[in-house]
């Protein structure tokens, strides 16, 4: 009788383990996303709006590169009014210009006749190829029913993001890998905040422009030496392999960024991470020689992608303000450019401009556009400040810079602006678009690093190690909305719970404890 009971107990333990494992494979376990509720009053909202005191006024607005529906309801009404009442709206890049697309595509490519396999070490190339095969296999499972309902197809989406990857420079492949996460794929379907503002400005017939060029943004990345690029690509692959294996969780996630933007502290660290779009590779677990490489990359990125970029953007803002004294402006840049040290605001103040933070709930009277900006010939389009924005290479005389100064520019690195192709100005995608292989669009070229991380687990440091990655880490799923139906005055923001798959080790431990208890009972 005792043996029979013991056998039944053993069978029960294994049955429990099997059922738990099946639950993990077939169902997602909800985890609190930690998102905050919408405040009851405007005064309680975070404000990323600054006012440049002039007549008419100019505004600086800090954005983040996430789907706009996740943050729009948390943006104060006075920020939206400033956008609505401004004559001109300027961004970091012209998000809807075909020239941007072709220039970025050319910048990312290796020299003619070279392939990635010729540049990368064999082991690193093999790991990269295997990871991309894994992503391609998983993409149909990552996509949401809502995305499929809008006509997005996994094969098309993968090729749109990773197409021709073997011809790209290694540093751009690294950024591409960071954009091929489940969280990023599931966020496709709604334009990011920057792109939404650009589309709204276009719909409202406002004058739009940019303060940066693609050529400027590409050069800093392409000037990294090969050893630095290989180090960065290896670190990136290691962290994604660890995420696949369930042994690692990124400290900076899209959800963290959204929470800080909507209701958290104005933490310059996390917003700088979003604005530079590159991880900090410094890690205390690295050996000394790799620490040196990581520090060199960190210093280079910080100088080129944040400080120099802030300086250049501010000088071009100043040029626009001087050349168009009777026009009101709304400058929408990444929030990280306005927070911390050596910011765009600091440069403006150093040049005599009075810039004040505009709290949520503060009322002001903005100057409304006098005429239709698109037909207003009084805009100084032939001025030195405006010549820069023409589709021709800028010369030194445009901004009083030498050719040498024009070369080391600043970078709006890939982010979730990478949405124009799927969502652009069309209602939906159809399979025929993939079959016809139409020209690639802006979002194919921009990638995002929202879920990248600045640290690496010590047990995965081996640069030539082969990783086993069978268990998945489920990341947030977005409940998307058709942005064409959402007007400037209102949006909806829903997200389903963040989910994590249970670790196999945890399940086996549970079964083992059950067996031990059973054996003790038998004895």
From Swiss-Prot:
Keywords: Cell membrane, Glycoprotein, Hydrolase, Membrane, Metal-binding, Metalloprotease, Protease, Signal, Transmembrane, Transmembrane helix, Wnt signaling pathway. It comes from the Eukaryota. InterPro entries: TIKI1/2-like (IPR040230), TraB/PrgY/GumN_fam (IPR002816). Divalent metal cations. Mn(2+) or Co(2+). GO terms for cellular component: organelle membrane; plasma membrane. It is found in: Cell membrane. Glycans are attached at residues 225, 234, 283, 341. It is an enzyme of class 3 (hydrolase). One of its GO terms (molecular function) is metalloendopeptidase activity. It is a single-pass type I membrane protein. Was named TIKI in reference to large-headed humanoid in Polynesian mythology. Belongs to the TIKI family. This is Metalloprotease TIKI2. It comes from Xenopus tropicalis.
